[in-house]
Amino acid sequence: MLYLASRSPRRHELLQRLDVPFQTLELDVPEVRAPGESPEHYVHRVALDKARAGLALVQADDAQAIVLGSDTEVVLGERVFGKPVDVDDAIAMLTVLAGRTHQVLTAVVLVGAQRPPLQALVVSEVTFDALDATRIAAYAASGEPMGKAGAYAIQGRAERFITHLSGSYSGVMGLPLFQTSQLLTAFGAH
């Protein structure tokens, strides 16, 4: 059985598009970047931590379990923009991202008992229009930025702020479908 180690409704929705049966695991895995840790290493580590935590939860009952972990972070330079803690934090993030091109890093990891993990890192570039304080405040007040890396949802109202996307749309949403499908096939789960 395939398990998705994620609370994200977007990842659940995206994984359904691959027509693979799976169950979702509700896990609480710390997402804290270590001092000096590169954004790439951080996103890989968190995805692996989620997958391993999920495997530890189910492998006693399912020896054939395959667990998918994923993490998405918005990055500008070496700064990682996680999920905003409140509306003011969302406004601060969006103010920095406005009028600039940033990267969205999404790592996908598959783990199974007695198998080495398989992983992929997808890097997309997203350019935001120049946004004034009024537009940023209105978007932040909508509540949509909460729970989203970088304080925006590409599939929601923030889509109108994006002038250019290079990379994976589904990766920016939280699960790059092409790469995930390849990993599942390589792992024998698709």
Swiss-Prot record:
InterPro entries: ITPase-like_fam, Maf-like. It is found in: Cytoplasm. Gene3D superfamilies: 3.90.950.10. Disulfide bonds: none annotated. The active site is at D71. Nucleoside triphosphate pyrophosphatase that hydrolyzes dTTP and UTP. May have a dual role in cell division arrest and in preventing the incorporation of modified nucleotides into cellular nucleic acids. This is dTTP/UTP pyrophosphatase.
